[in-house]
């Protein structure tokens, strides 16, 4: 087996927002096929496609009704086969989303499971009796607000759902469940799928005594340590590796909620035979006020020193065992220029600066669609958001418990809401940004005439071509893959500076992640400037707002 993923740059596609070829307002698989040459021009090696399986779309496809069938909204199984062929013909690999913590409540297994207590599929899911007073079995909360338990009148029991009530959690303790999942994985990998991004994989093992959380007064439900990293998690993943993954030359990345560096080592240490890498969430919480009942919606100002500390800890701790998945954006996170940077005056410089920092790190970088043209957060009104997380949080935090005012909540959503990343891809300056000839499923960002692919391809100094250059550098110099990381100037409030070094090469990566001009000592003449985001980068002892550079030294 090769470790092709160590040199790869991955591009995430959220299909419903990527490109629509049939005018129904929803992106589709043929839309991805139509844009493969664009992605080849960008230079990426691999595409991760968010779920396209048959689904009622309660949580935009993360509620799966049939794992082996493509949803007609996106196309057909034949379209998927053709997409694999077309991508592979261009040297691009395809990774699919593996959503196996839960299914849809419309999946055949759950339809059977809820019929009776002695149904053969009953223990494919978690069913529990109510407490004597009729309330849920414990005080676990759903990630989408409310209780993690839903009462079902047919049998008088509750079923467990960490997400929406239409997403019942699978019982991984049941060997039949695991075999069904492994068979499904082989079905897709035998068609040519090159790997998996594993949705909330850290939650598949449950604490089977279902202990209550200790909660502060006034709080009804808890979300925390019992929602992830259960006792058999690593045994399950090792079994999956043994039964399926080890038989294919594939890439695996796990979404590991609640993981620290120690847990990451367990997932990704080569001798553990589990996954190649995981997405951690620690760095994405630098703008979240800890311990607030408002959760992710409790904002605090972006703190670069804290971001450097977190990213550096993950770089140091996984240096010799394991691997980092590098990202600032995905379908669950807002646009980085709007969230942590400047999306107006310095939008281009800012987008390039954050890209420089991320792509210089050790690990596999993930680019989310639109990130390569500097797309910005949505400018929607509350009623225009589609996301179930936003709608449920508004109900709980504003309407029911008055934890936030409507204005406070809208401010937080405009900063961090998932729909900021889900507005349609901006292809050109025409109506609906060239995404669809119909009515888009989510409103197109109003700045599409200023920010779009066609414009970016015409401008030699665009964000797109900067990303293209970064990807070429990662492919050209081994030090990007294997160089040891060292953080410099850890306490500087505006500069992020680090080195990467192997036996024969050294990089110096520097970025001013602020709107201030700051002093920065250029390295001596032995260093070569590989890339900078101002025309004359490297000629002054000052770093202008969001200025960034990568320098190279051959030892």
Curated annotation (Swiss-Prot):
InterPro entries: Glyco_hydro_13_cat_dom, Glyco_hydro_b, Glycoside_hydrolase_SF, Malt_amylase-like_C, O16G_dom_2. It catalyses: Hydrolysis of (1->6)-alpha-D-glucosidic linkages in some oligosaccharides produced from starch and glycogen by alpha-amylase, and in isomaltose. It comes from the Bacteria. Coiled coil: none annotated. Its EC number is 3.2.1.10. The record marks 332 as: Transition state stabilizer. GO terms for molecular function: alpha-amylase activity; oligo-1,6-glucosidase activity. Pfam families: Alpha-amylase, Malt_amylase_C. It is found in: Cytoplasm. The active site is at 199 (nucleophile), 255 (proton donor). Signal peptide: none annotated. The keyword Cytoplasm applies. SUPFAM superfamilies: (Trans)glycosidases, Glycosyl hydrolase domain. GO terms for cellular component: cytoplasm. Keywords: Cytoplasm, Glycosidase, Hydrolase. One of its GO terms (biological process) is oligosaccharide catabolic process. Belongs to the glycosyl hydrolase 13 family. This is Oligo-1,6-glucosidase.
